[in-house]
C-alpha cells in the first residue's frame, strides 16, 4: 500500500480485524493549502491502530514497494519494513492515550504523509472496540446478491477515491 500502513490483527481478541490507515483528509487539505494547524499536524489518520494497555503487542513489518520504517518514539520502537523480508518488534503501552509516529525512512514523494497513530485503551474499552469493529466489518461485508443503486456506488467510489487517489490526483480530480 503505497504511502499507507496496513494493519492485520493476526492473533488474540482482535483476530480477523484488518484495515488500511492513511493520512486524514483534513490534514492533507491543510498541507496543500500551506496552513498547518494544531499540535498533531500531519499525524492524524483516518483509522488508528488500537491496542490494549499493559499487553505485549507484536508488530510484524514488510513492504511491497520500498523500504519504510514503523516508528513510534513514545514506545521506543522503530522497525524497518523491507520488501521481501518479514521483520518484527514489540512494545507494551503502560498508559492509555494517543501516541504518534511516522515512517522513518525517506520512501518517496509522499513520505511526509505516512503518519502512525496508536490509540491505547484499557482492557475493557479495548474489548468493546473489538466487538464494535467486528460488527462494523460484518456490516460492510458485501452481499453477492445485493443490487447496488447508483447513489450507493457513487458514495463507495468517492470514499475509495478520497482514501487512495486524492493524494496524487487532488480532491477535484485535476491533479
Give a label for each model feature.
Residues 1-166, 171-174:
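Non-transmembrane, membrane-proximal soluble domains of secreted or membrane proteins
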Amino acid at each position: 500500500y503505497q504511502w499507507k500502513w496496513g494493519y492485520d490483527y493476526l492473533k488474540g481478541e482482535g483476530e480477523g480485524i484488518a484495515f488500511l490507515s492513511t493520512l486524514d483528509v483534513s490534514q492533507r487539505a491543510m498541507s496543500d493549502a500551506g496552513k498547518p494547524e494544531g499540535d498533531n499536524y500531519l499525524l492524524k489518520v483516518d483509522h488508528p491502530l488500537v491496542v490494549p494497555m499493559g499487553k505485549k503487542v507484536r508488530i510484524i513489518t514488510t513492504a511491497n514497494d520500498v523500504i519504510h520504517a514503523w516508528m513510534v518514539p513514545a514506545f521506543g520502537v522503530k522497525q524497518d519494513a523491507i520488501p521481501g523480508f518479514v521483520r518484527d518488534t514489540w512494545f507494551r503501552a503502560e498508559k492509555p492515550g494517543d501516541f504518534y509516529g511516522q515512517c522513518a525512512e525517506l520512501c518517496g514523494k509522499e513520505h511526509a504523509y505516512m503518519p502512525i497513530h496508536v490509540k491505547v485503551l484499557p482492557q475493557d474499552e479495548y474489548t468493546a472496540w473489538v466487538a464494535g469493529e467486528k460488527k462494523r466489518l460484518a456490516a460492510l461485508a458485501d452481499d453477492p446478491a445485493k443490487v447496488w443503486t447508483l447513489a450507493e456506488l457513487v458514495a463507495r467510489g468517492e470514499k475509495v477515491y478520497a482514501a487512495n487517489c486524492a493524494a496524487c490526483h487532488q480532491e477535484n480530480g485535476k491533479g
